[in-house]
């Protein structure tokens, strides 16, 4: 008697092509590139095993539990068109394998160990289906799109932001001055750069105080609600919370966090604090390209975006689309919808492998940021629609007349695009014309159009 010791093929236990997925299963789509000679079924089963209950050999303690209840299952494998020896392996995980309300545990289980696996040349997590039963264990974004609009009293248009540059080296007072000029000119938000934390040339508390002063001055002057994303990211969770608490004491509307470098545990704690204390939370995705840039290894950004919506954030950076290829546009809009909408249909052309129901979890505003300027405004307005934040760093501060006129130019361009769209004009076709018309009655915009007329970021 006893049990049958020894090494056996994963696929005997973990490859179950006739498995019917349950509504409570977490489903994963992996792009698997097996080593030469490893059959795809074995590779897919190995992924299912190593990311759930399996280990490399049969163990005595397997008999003390019900593997059938707890094991991950590879239930479908399809070859990737146009790629040699590459497959999409679909894996179903029983819900009981995961701790409630912990993105950290979800990732530790699904991607924690299996990516270094010898039988695979490369492995990429393309998408996750989060079952409603699991979604309901997360708070999600502190406030969401609708509550944010109500807090800011801004409707029917995208919001405008600007990252303060030079990102490192300004003193706190000069930094606050730059913030004030941008907000006074017509932006809704300014932003700490992701690597502005608390350095010798500008300690966090000084920056917070001067930025708060800038916000209040600009609000008094413009009659609009303003914000500055105060970066609370720090070396310890305690220090991060200290910064968030100080921001709340100053009465500012929004703080910021780098969720990948800071980690999901810290991010979820901060998101809970933000909801309890009425702070909006802006999320920067520093480090994402380390994880998502390789096409055949790592984790696709749409998974990191889903994870952020569960962990909590009101804004997240999501790429700009402009000047890039058409295909990328569909993929980007796919995960932008995953961030904003309540229900998203499976659509492989947009990279969405599973239908996702968020069961009323609040939405996240996508942030378009990086290398954009006034000439991009029509395209951005058309692509992202109203529920987005458009961030022009150099596109504001690079204005020949300074920050405030740079902000004016962006605001005029945005209002012109929104008005044109509402009048039924085609932003994609008439975009340049709309900006040209608007620049006739805005010298600030005309100057911006001059500076950036030739710039294109196409490689």
Swiss-Prot record:
Keywords carried by this UniProt record: Calvin cycle, Carbon dioxide fixation, Chloroplast, Disulfide bond, Lyase, Magnesium, Metal-binding, Methylation, Monooxygenase, Oxidoreductase, Photorespiration, Photosynthesis, Plastid
Catalytic activity from the UniProt record: 2 (2R)-3-phosphoglycerate + 2 H(+) = D-ribulose 1,5-bisphosphate + CO2 + H2O; D-ribulose 1,5-bisphosphate + O2 = 2-phosphoglycolate + (2R)-3-phosphoglycerate + 2 H(+)
Keyword Disulfide bond: yes
Cofactor(s) in the UniProt record: Mg(2+)
Residues engaged in binding Mg(2+): 191, 193-194
Broad class of where this protein is predominantly found: plastid
Molecular functions per Gene Ontology: magnesium ion binding; monooxygenase activity; ribulose-bisphosphate carboxylase activity
InterPro entries linked to this entry: RuBisCO, RuBisCo_large_chain_AS, RuBisCO_lsu_C, RuBisCO_lsu_C_sf, RuBisCO_lsu_fd_N, RuBisCO_lsu_N_sf, RuBisCO_lsuI
Modification after translation (UniProt): The disulfide bond which can form in the large chain dimeric partners within the hexadecamer appears to be associated with oxidative stress and protein turnover.
Pfam families: RuBisCO_large, RuBisCO_large_N
EC number: 4.1.1.39
Modified sites of kind N6-carboxylysine: 191
Function: RuBisCO catalyzes two reactions: the carboxylation of D-ribulose 1,5-bisphosphate, the primary event in carbon dioxide fixation, as well as the oxidative fragmentation of the pentose substrate in the photorespiration process. Both reactions occur simultaneously and in competition at the same active site.
Further remarks about this protein from its record: The basic functional RuBisCO is composed of a large chain homodimer in a 'head-to-tail' conformation. In form I RuBisCO this homodimer is arranged in a barrel-like tetramer with the small subunits forming a tetrameric 'cap' on each end of the 'barrel'.
Name this polypeptide is given: Ribulose bisphosphate carboxylase large chain
Organism name: Ceratopetalum gummiferum (New South Wales Christmas bush)
Originating gene: rbcL
